[in-house]
Every structure is written in structure tokens, then in C-alpha cells.
Amino acid sequence: MCFALNISFEKLFLRLNDELSNEQKDEYLKLCERLSLGEPFEYISGVCEFLGREFMVNSSVLIPRIETEILVQKCLKIIKRQNFKNIIDIGTGSGIIAISLALSLPNANILATDLSLKALQTAKENAKKFGVKNISFLQSDLLENFNQNADIIISNPPYIARDYPLSISVLNEPSLGLFGGIKGDEILINLIKQAKNRCKYLACEIGYDQKASMQTALKNAGFKARFYKDLAGFTRGFIAHIENFKLKIS
């Protein structure tokens, strides 16, 4: 209702007894119909909050989730502790990871990549909105289209299994950003293999049931990993480093 009337919740509360005009009723009913058909509200409104900031979103990018905030916060701690300067964000989507990092790390050099040109355009628009200057954007399938290395590679890649049951609302999001293959972990495993000689650290969000396959893939690639949980207590990601890279203890 607030969105349909273009007013704040506080103003809506003060106008509870006001009668809607026919135009306002029509707008509200159209909004309800779109929601009933499974269109995410974030696509209707065109915005979504992430780490306290309002990012532009549309049907070409995934809707940011709170789980990814955990990934960004953990990476920020590592980057600051290790004084890393070169960062790569794989599958940037709307740019939430790269931009959130750039705003906290103005001296870092960040490369944000995505396979989707439409997603990259959205990320560029968000970077412009926040006045971020230290991000470059590139179309790439994982690490295949460039040779640049990084101190840390960060990714929230597609990791859902092809046959996993999803709500209509989620199915309205781009499949390119949702599904990681038949099992769901194929893209993650491929990324780990590609990152082996390209970074000191690799940090990824993963599916709740993918810890075992990630442990195997990371070990085979020479990474030593720590896994972390989301707010619901499920395994949700890992922070890995090449074993011969010396950690700085804070």
C-alpha cells in the first residue's frame, strides 16, 4: 500500500481513515495482481536493501539476500587484516558485493564480472548511484575471459540443484543466477579449480548441503578452508586460502 500510494508507513498510518481515489484503487489492485502472479516485490519497486543501502534491482539480477551480507562482512575483516588491494567479484549481479566492498575500501582495486551483460549494466548503474570509482566491470564466464590475479576472489555463484523445488516468486528471478547444475555444486567446483593459481584467498557462498563436496574440491585444489553458518544455523559459505600462504594473526 505504501508503494502504491508513494508514501511512508508513518504517513499511511496517519491516513488510515482516508478514502482512496479510483486511480489509487486501480494502482493498488494492479500491484496486488502482479504479486499474486509471483512477481517479486523488489522487482516491482525496483529496489532492495543490502547492508543498510538501497540498491537498484530488476529481473536481470538476483534479489540480494541477507545470507550474502554475512559473506561481505567476513571478507571485509580478512581484506583489512591482510591489507589486500586486489579483489575480484565473480558473478556480480546487481553489484552488491563489489560496491559494498568498494565503499568500505576506497583504496582497493576491484574487478566485478558477470556472464550477463544486462546484469553488468545494472551493477554499473548501482556503482554510479553510490559514486564508486574503484570498480571495473567485465563480461566473463567465471575466470575464463581474463588473466588478472587477485589477493582474494569472492563469489555468490549459482548453487541450487536443477530439480530443487522453488517458490513461484524465486522462479521469477533469472535462472542463470539460480541454478548451479544438476547437483547444484558444479559451478562452484569449476570456480575452485580455476581459482587455484589465481588468488591467495577464495570466499564463496554455498548451498546448505554442499559442505562435503566443497571440502573435497578445495582440498584437491590446494586450499585450506573454514566454513561458516548463516543466521538459521545452516552451512552457508567458506573462506579458503592457499595452504602455503602465511596468515597474519590479528
Model-identified regions with their sequence ranges:
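Conserved AdoMet
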Residues: 2-77
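Short loop/edge segments at beta-strand edges and connector loops
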Residues: 45, 139-140, 206, 229
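Conserved Class I SAM-dependent methyltransferase catalytic core
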Residues: 182-241
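Short, basic, low-complexity termini and linkers enriched in Ser/Thr/Gly/Pro
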Residues: 80-81, 86, 242-250
